[in-house]
């Protein structure tokens, strides 16, 4: 954990002795094999935490040891969940604004497409623009020493002026992200208007959802809808989605114990 750099937490450790004590006078090759190692967590490089697998070779000497390390990146694949319900929520102000939004499902693989719609039931405010964002929230540590960091990975900006743009995020983070701004609405919406949503996830740097990994950290994703009126007032609603890594075509299915994607 980056805020606790002095401590490292091992969750897996296997050791093999490749050669008995002796003299090494010329180049020599030693073979090794760690069989059927269960790697229960996926590799992760976040804002405040890093989970890594690596091979370490150590040559013990009377003086300083010679140590070399090689990182291994581990993916954890899942199969699609049997139950995948849609998300339906609304946001509004009494007698001024009432908007309903719907997403076709709540769990997505990392190359999936988010399909949904925004439906305006009541509009008595002049909406300047809307934003649809994917937010990653990383929680590390345990209470009372718990840290929460949020970063916006994707932001679709909807305005009454067509300005496709690329810009840097406004928050301070150790990770550099890019915002993608696209127009999906021209002018202020009227009552009964429906705006479709179609967001392709494959082009963005996303990880699966992680929950209580080794009781050290969690990573969750949220779809955030924000509306801003002419007076710069903001109305927003967030809904959690679950992301998982789908096994490539032709790869054997994930293990049975990983079949069901957990639901918060």
Which residue ranges define each predicted feature?
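C-terminal beta-sandwich interaction modules and adjacent acidic
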Residues: 1-264
């Amino acid at each position: 954990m980056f805020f606790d750099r002095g401590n490292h937490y091992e969750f897996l450790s296997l050791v093999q002795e490749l050669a008995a004590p002796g003299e090494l006078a010329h180049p020599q090759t030693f073979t090794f094999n760690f069989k059927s190692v269960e790697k229960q967590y996926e590799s992760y490089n976040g804002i405040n935490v890093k989970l890594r697998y690596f091979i370490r070779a150590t040559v013990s000497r009377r003086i300083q040891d010679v140590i070399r390390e090689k990182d291994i990146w581990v993916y954890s694949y899942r199969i699609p969940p049997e139950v995948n319900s849609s998300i339906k929520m609304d946001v509004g102000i009494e007698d001024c604004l009432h908007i309903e939004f719907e997403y076709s499902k709540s769990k997505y693989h990392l190359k999936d497409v988010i399909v949904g719609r925004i439906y305006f039931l009541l509009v008595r405010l002049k909406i300047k623009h809307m934003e649809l964002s994917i937010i990653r929230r990383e929680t590390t540590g345990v209470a009372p020493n718990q840290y929460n960091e949020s970063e916006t990975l994707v932001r679709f900006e909807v305005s009454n002026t067509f300005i496709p743009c690329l810009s840097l995020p406004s928050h301070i983070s150790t990770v550099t992200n890019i915002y993608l701004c696209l127009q999906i609405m021209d002018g202020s919406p009227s009552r009964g208007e429906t705006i479709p949503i179609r967001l392709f996830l494959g082009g963005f740097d996303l990880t699966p959802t992680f929950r209580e990994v080794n009781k050290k950290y969690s990573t969750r994703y949220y779809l955030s809808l924000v509306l801003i009126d002419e007076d710069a007032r903001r109305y927003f609603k967030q809904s959690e989605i679950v992301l998982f890594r789908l096994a490539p075509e032709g790869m054997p299915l994930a293990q049975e114990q990983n079949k069901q994607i957990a639901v918060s």
